[in-house]
């Protein structure tokens, strides 16, 4: 059948690719041996190794050299790896590792392993995929910690200038496996310098910086600040605005001058969940539209005193407390008379509140589908 022909040709192509890769690597390694600085690199023979690629395992030999460093220590190196800037995760090639990462964001470890094994020339087990992801995750954590330390030391300074920096943060819970708790909270943050017009009444965020992690609030904010500083020159930023749901871990940001606004989506959701009567909901929004915050609280107190149902009274009490804890942020920044400096790139300033879309695209779509559970 055509399927059989297709499969045999694919297998043959993978076999040829493995042989071509072996020949190319070994020839390049021989060339490096000839042109090397023989005084600096003392040959210590060849070593056999294997690299797992998208077209299967490639076995080849490469020369190892002894090098004496300036501090007098001796080190063994592979010139071939140095010249090719070889990056691996164990025996997995960088490109194959990237395919595994792309697959695991949408699939389980088992499905990802089956997909890679079926569509490439490389067979891999679910545990093999897990090991690769763990190794990459540890490397990412090391890079993040290094960035935070460099930021604390004052070495991080981005090149982009943003007179106004818009920031949003939120959290989402995902199922955990083999952990003491059933669910774990992932913190997500995004920063951008404005909106770019992409069409008639169509806009996109400009200069996005997105961070996410299971870390505690202190560690999350430290990394968030470092990631922002890596892109933006914070000395040029005059105003920072944070849009969030009012959670304490979000409001305790590093910059005390950050302007906070309660995310309109969460604000309106809280109103709808606490108030069952459409007329009362309309009245609440009218107070907000008139920017009459004192009148809003008077109305909520009067509404609470007018009801007799204990459960509804409790819900209204929680709403009043929620609004009281976020009183300064009940109105969006656009309704507070805040004068924002113009952006040199011609960006526009609009209403904030994109976090829910990013929660879905960054976390929920990848980590909450198919009842998936995760370990941390």
PLM region spans:
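Basic, low-complexity segments
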Residues: 14-91
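Catalytic center-proximal scaffold of phosphoryl-transfer enzymes
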Residues: 1-22, 69-376
